[in-house]
Amino acid sequence: MFRSVSLSSLIPFLIIVSIAMQRPENDVPMIMQSSWLVNEVIKSINSNGQYINALIKKDFQPTVLPVSFILRILKFTATTDSKDITAVLADSTHKIFAIFLFFPAIVDFENKYHHRMTYNTRSCLIRIHKANLKFMDKSTVKKCYGRKSDGGLAIAVLEVLEFDIFFKDQYSFINSIENRLKYVYDDVEYNQLCGKKKHKPEYEDLMCDI
Protein backbone atom coordinates (compact mmCIF):
# COMPACT_ATOMS: atom_id res chain seq x y z
CA MET A 1 0.00 0.00 0.00
CA PHE A 2 1.23 3.46 -0.85
CA ARG A 3 1.12 6.22 1.72
CA SER A 4 -1.88 8.50 1.30
CA VAL A 5 -1.15 12.20 0.92
CA SER A 6 -3.51 14.91 2.15
CA LEU A 7 -4.19 17.93 -0.03
CA SER A 8 -3.07 20.31 2.71
CA SER A 9 0.37 18.71 2.75
CA LEU A 10 0.77 19.35 -0.99
CA ILE A 11 -0.20 23.02 -1.13
CA PRO A 12 3.18 24.58 -0.21
CA PHE A 13 5.00 23.00 -3.12
CA LEU A 14 2.24 22.11 -5.58
CA ILE A 15 2.75 23.11 -9.19
CA ILE A 16 -0.10 22.09 -11.45
CA VAL A 17 0.88 19.93 -14.40
CA SER A 18 -0.53 20.90 -17.77
CA ILE A 19 0.20 20.00 -21.37
CA ALA A 20 3.73 21.08 -22.29
CA MET A 21 2.60 22.92 -25.43
CA GLN A 22 0.44 25.18 -23.29
CA ARG A 23 3.36 26.30 -21.14
CA PRO A 24 5.87 29.09 -21.80
CA GLU A 25 9.08 27.78 -23.34
CA ASN A 26 11.18 28.15 -20.17
CA ASP A 27 8.55 26.85 -17.78
CA VAL A 28 9.19 23.23 -16.84
CA PRO A 29 5.97 21.52 -15.69
CA MET A 30 6.75 19.67 -12.46
CA ILE A 31 4.46 18.59 -9.69
CA MET A 32 4.88 18.97 -5.95
CA GLN A 33 8.48 20.09 -6.30
CA SER A 34 10.52 23.21 -5.77
CA SER A 35 13.92 24.34 -7.00
CA TRP A 36 16.24 24.02 -4.00
CA LEU A 37 18.76 21.28 -4.66
CA VAL A 38 21.62 23.24 -6.23
CA ASN A 39 21.51 25.98 -3.59
CA GLU A 40 21.56 23.52 -0.70
CA VAL A 41 24.42 21.51 -2.22
CA ILE A 42 26.49 24.65 -2.73
CA LYS A 43 25.67 25.92 0.76
CA SER A 44 26.72 22.61 2.31
CA ILE A 45 30.03 22.49 0.44
CA ASN A 46 30.75 26.16 1.04
CA SER A 47 30.30 25.79 4.81
CA ASN A 48 33.62 23.96 5.07
CA GLY A 49 36.60 24.82 2.92
CA GLN A 50 38.61 21.68 3.65
CA TYR A 51 37.60 18.02 3.96
CA ILE A 52 39.63 15.22 5.49
CA ASN A 53 37.22 12.58 4.15
CA ALA A 54 34.53 12.30 1.49
CA LEU A 55 31.62 13.33 3.74
CA ILE A 56 30.34 16.83 3.01
CA LYS A 57 27.26 16.96 5.22
CA LYS A 58 25.58 14.39 7.41
CA ASP A 59 21.76 14.52 7.47
CA PHE A 60 21.61 16.66 4.33
CA GLN A 61 18.17 18.22 3.77
CA PRO A 62 16.44 21.42 2.63
CA THR A 63 16.81 24.26 5.13
CA VAL A 64 14.25 26.66 3.65
CA LEU A 65 10.61 26.19 4.62
CA PRO A 66 8.17 25.07 3.29
CA VAL A 67 10.37 23.05 0.93
CA SER A 68 10.16 19.31 1.53
CA PHE A 69 12.81 16.71 0.63
CA ILE A 70 10.94 15.42 -2.42
CA LEU A 71 12.82 14.36 -5.54
CA ARG A 72 11.89 12.53 -8.74
CA ILE A 73 13.71 9.38 -9.82
CA LEU A 74 14.86 10.04 -13.37
CA LYS A 75 16.72 6.79 -13.93
CA PHE A 76 18.66 3.98 -12.29
CA THR A 77 22.21 3.67 -13.57
CA ALA A 78 23.97 0.71 -11.92
CA THR A 79 24.21 -1.75 -9.03
CA THR A 80 27.37 -1.86 -6.93
CA ASP A 81 29.14 -4.94 -5.63
CA SER A 82 27.53 -4.14 -2.25
CA LYS A 83 24.05 -4.25 -3.85
CA ASP A 84 23.65 -0.48 -3.54
CA ILE A 85 21.77 1.12 -6.44
CA THR A 86 22.94 4.29 -8.15
CA ALA A 87 20.48 6.69 -9.75
CA VAL A 88 19.83 10.21 -10.98
CA LEU A 89 17.33 12.28 -8.96
CA ALA A 90 15.87 15.72 -9.66
CA ASP A 91 13.95 18.60 -8.17
CA SER A 92 12.09 20.99 -10.49
CA THR A 93 15.24 22.41 -12.10
CA HIS A 94 18.34 20.35 -11.28
CA LYS A 95 19.64 16.78 -11.27
CA ILE A 96 22.07 15.06 -8.93
CA PHE A 97 23.73 11.65 -8.75
CA ALA A 98 22.48 9.50 -5.88
CA ILE A 99 23.29 6.15 -4.33
CA PHE A 100 20.68 4.15 -2.40
CA LEU A 101 22.46 2.04 0.20
CA PHE A 102 21.36 -1.60 0.22
CA PHE A 103 21.11 -1.39 4.00
CA PRO A 104 19.18 0.30 5.35
CA ALA A 105 17.53 2.13 2.44
CA ILE A 106 16.75 -0.64 -0.05
CA VAL A 107 16.08 -3.37 2.52
CA ASP A 108 13.64 -1.18 4.46
CA PHE A 109 11.90 0.00 1.28
CA GLU A 110 11.39 -3.50 -0.11
CA ASN A 111 10.16 -4.82 3.24
CA LYS A 112 7.63 -1.99 3.40
CA TYR A 113 6.31 -2.14 -0.18
CA HIS A 114 6.87 -5.86 -0.89
CA HIS A 115 8.46 -5.32 -4.28
CA ARG A 116 11.88 -4.50 -5.66
CA MET A 117 12.95 -0.92 -5.32
CA THR A 118 13.34 -0.52 -9.08
CA TYR A 119 9.88 -1.92 -9.90
CA ASN A 120 7.71 0.84 -11.42
CA THR A 121 9.48 3.57 -9.45
CA ARG A 122 11.25 5.33 -12.29
CA SER A 123 9.76 8.84 -12.68
CA CYS A 124 8.00 8.55 -9.30
CA LEU A 125 8.32 11.16 -6.57
CA ILE A 126 10.05 10.00 -3.41
CA ARG A 127 10.34 11.63 -0.01
CA ILE A 128 13.80 11.26 1.48
CA HIS A 129 13.86 11.06 5.26
CA LYS A 130 17.59 10.61 5.79
CA ALA A 131 20.56 11.19 3.51
CA ASN A 132 24.16 12.31 3.48
CA LEU A 133 25.99 14.44 0.95
CA LYS A 134 29.46 13.18 0.04
CA PHE A 135 32.11 13.39 -2.63
CA MET A 136 32.62 10.37 -4.87
CA ASP A 137 35.82 9.42 -6.63
CA LYS A 138 36.01 10.07 -10.37
CA SER A 139 36.50 6.42 -11.36
CA THR A 140 33.30 5.42 -9.54
CA VAL A 141 31.40 8.34 -11.08
CA LYS A 142 32.47 7.17 -14.53
CA LYS A 143 31.63 3.50 -13.84
CA CYS A 144 28.32 4.02 -12.04
CA TYR A 145 26.94 7.12 -13.78
CA GLY A 146 28.76 7.23 -17.10
CA ARG A 147 30.07 10.76 -16.53
CA LYS A 148 33.60 11.49 -17.67
CA SER A 149 35.93 13.47 -15.44
CA ASP A 150 35.71 17.26 -15.81
CA GLY A 151 39.30 18.07 -14.93
CA GLY A 152 39.57 18.61 -11.19
CA LEU A 153 35.84 18.99 -10.55
CA ALA A 154 34.77 17.23 -7.35
CA ILE A 155 31.43 15.40 -7.69
CA ALA A 156 28.96 15.50 -4.79
CA VAL A 157 26.57 12.56 -4.53
CA LEU A 158 23.45 12.09 -2.43
CA GLU A 159 23.74 8.99 -0.24
CA VAL A 160 20.18 7.90 0.57
CA LEU A 161 19.61 6.04 3.85
CA GLU A 162 15.83 6.22 4.29
CA PHE A 163 13.03 7.07 1.86
CA ASP A 164 9.53 6.17 0.78
CA ILE A 165 7.13 6.75 -2.10
CA PHE A 166 5.55 10.19 -1.93
CA PHE A 167 3.47 9.98 -5.10
CA LYS A 168 3.11 6.64 -6.87
CA ASP A 169 2.14 7.95 -10.32
CA GLN A 170 5.02 8.06 -12.79
CA TYR A 171 5.66 11.41 -14.45
CA SER A 172 7.95 11.83 -17.42
CA PHE A 173 7.97 14.48 -20.11
CA ILE A 174 9.09 14.81 -23.71
CA ASN A 175 12.85 15.10 -24.19
CA SER A 176 12.77 18.82 -24.88
CA ILE A 177 11.36 19.34 -21.38
CA GLU A 178 13.42 16.74 -19.55
CA ASN A 179 16.57 18.18 -21.13
CA ARG A 180 15.96 21.50 -19.40
CA LEU A 181 16.92 19.87 -16.12
CA LYS A 182 20.55 20.73 -15.47
CA TYR A 183 23.06 18.87 -13.33
CA VAL A 184 24.10 20.69 -10.17
CA TYR A 185 27.67 20.05 -11.36
CA ASP A 186 27.14 22.35 -14.36
CA ASP A 187 26.16 25.31 -12.17
CA VAL A 188 28.68 28.16 -12.41
CA GLU A 189 28.95 28.60 -8.65
CA TYR A 190 29.38 24.86 -8.10
CA ASN A 191 32.20 24.82 -10.66
CA GLN A 192 33.90 27.78 -9.03
CA LEU A 193 33.67 26.10 -5.64
CA CYS A 194 34.47 22.48 -6.52
CA GLY A 195 36.71 22.90 -9.53
CA LYS A 196 39.52 24.35 -7.44
CA LYS A 197 39.29 22.13 -4.38
CA LYS A 198 42.71 21.44 -2.87
CA HIS A 199 41.54 18.80 -0.44
CA LYS A 200 42.13 15.14 -1.22
CA PRO A 201 39.50 13.17 0.73
CA GLU A 202 39.69 9.42 1.02
CA TYR A 203 37.25 7.94 -1.49
CA GLU A 204 35.65 4.53 -1.52
CA ASP A 205 36.12 2.96 -4.94
CA LEU A 206 32.93 1.08 -5.84
CA MET A 207 32.46 -1.64 -8.43
CA CYS A 208 29.33 -1.16 -10.52
CA ASP A 209 27.36 -3.39 -12.87
CA ILE A 210 25.49 -1.39 -15.49
Curated annotation (Swiss-Prot):
Sorted UniProt keywords: Chromosome, Nucleus, Telomere
Gene Ontology molecular function terms on file: telomeric DNA binding
Compartments where found: Nucleus; Chromosome, Telomere
Superkingdom classification of source: Eukaryota
Secretion signal span: none
Any GO BP annotation: telomere formation via telomerase
Keyword Nucleus appears in the UniProt entry: yes
Cellular component, GO annotation: chromosome, telomeric region; telomerase holoenzyme complex
Annotated Pfam families: TPP1
Subunit architecture: Component of the telomerase complex.
Family: Belongs to the EST3 family.
Function: Component of the telomerase complex involved in telomere replication. Stimulates RNA/DNA heteroduplex unwinding which favors the telomere replication by the telomerase.
Protein name: Telomere replication protein EST3
Recorded name of the encoding gene: EST3
